[in-house]
Amino acid sequence: MSGFNDGVGPMKTNRRQFVKAFGGLSATLPFSTLAAEATRTGAKNQNPRYAKLDEILRQPVLNREYFTSPVIIETLELLRYKDNFLCRVRSRDGAEGNSVGHSGLNALYPIFTHNLHPFFIGKDARDLDLLLEKVFIYNFNFRYNGISIGTPLATVEFAILDMLGRIAGKSIGQLIGDIHHPEVTVYQATEYREKSVEESLELIKRDVAEYNARALKIKIGGLMFMTTDINAVGPPGRTEKMIPLIRKTFGDQMALFADANGFYSVKEAIRAGKLLEEYRYGFFEEPVMFDWREETKQVAEGLSLPIALGEQEYSLHGFRWLIANDAIQIVQPDNYYFGGMIRSMKVARMAAAFGKSCTPHMSGGGLGFLYMMHFVSALANAMPHHEFKGLKTNVQFECKTSPLKVVDGKIKVPTGPGLGVDIDPAYVSKHQVVRA
């Protein structure tokens, strides 16, 4: 796509050209719902973009035409084996779907059993768009906004989508859109911000070599999340050394991206961003704290480098503001944290309406890479590369339609019904139902 800097080669693009490069997508994309009260047109001086975004939000995501008869949810179970979680849903007609839960359910499973389970029983799964809206109202669940409800809710949604896909003989990607990407090109995500430059580089080189990655994201800044020491700081000067060193080490053909996880002030974010621009990085993720929306916009205005955000964002209207006000150029909803693929697709389609692109944040562990792949397969405004944290998992399963291997930086998306994999019954049998 002309005008888009993928982190490879010279960067001549400014933000307006970046937005223009993705223009034209908006006319092709239908969309899903939020409550009518939440999308009602406001004052006359309201940003005119909101009317367009609100119209997009009113359109459904789930391709309901695949289902001519009700699919009534009869049972919804959360299963646990040690620190592993599965979700199993069954319809009155005997259809079944399964999902793999995020490790965060170790702390959040009571929200599944108390706040979500009662709501979904007896509902028609074909109404999934509306269910994902109204579940926030039930029991004042919106008070649990963010990962606390998003992660359990996504676990429910993934299982329902797996069931619906098996009923219709369609992949999850086909249920939430048209297939645009039968293969997903990935970038290797790395961490190591607390380590020295030398040690970080060796670990990053190891990670890149393991999957022969063609694209890479590094961490910059000194967000010391891994310690209780309130005085802890990262290695001095690490960012200033890492940014040019990574480019020099991997060359101009490697697409590079950077993530600060909200570490910087506006001034320091712009300073770091200028260095990223100099060394041709493709985007700058979370330059300031995710909920500093005005400050994020200030950083975006101070750089030509695209700003990416969304891992921590929990609100559809939060994304709505960021998009309408050009605070970001790339949306990154996390399919787990944000409450599933349908809500995430709403974000992607809002972004597409204004020439912005989407690359989801990927939660590691479980089968997070599979949920990422199905979501990306249906993205009309997908970025060229998508986050990848490896294929390692404790889940025992079989996939008949994809080798699930990284070849030339790409992974083939499974084409079987639902998630496209069958979880080993012997593995499932190790799990016990979690009771309320």
Regions found by a protein language model. Give the residues of each.
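C-terminal segment of N-terminal export signals and the immediately downstream linker at the start
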Residues: 32-79, 96
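Shared catalytic-loop signature of beta/alpha-barrel
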Residues: 118, 123, 130, 134, ...
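Short beta-strand elements
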Residues: 85-93
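Metal-dependent enolase-superfamily TIM-barrel catalytic cores that perform enediolate-based chemistry
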Residues: 183-298
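N-terminal secretory signal peptides and thylakoid transit peptides that target proteins
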Residues: 5-26
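Conserved, mostly hydrophobic/aromatic
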Residues: 94, 156, 169, 259, ...
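Metal- or metallocofactor-binding catalytic centers and their adjacent structured scaffolds
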Residues: 50, 96-168
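Glycine-rich, aromatic-flanked loop segments that form ligand/cofactor-binding clefts
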Residues: 157-195
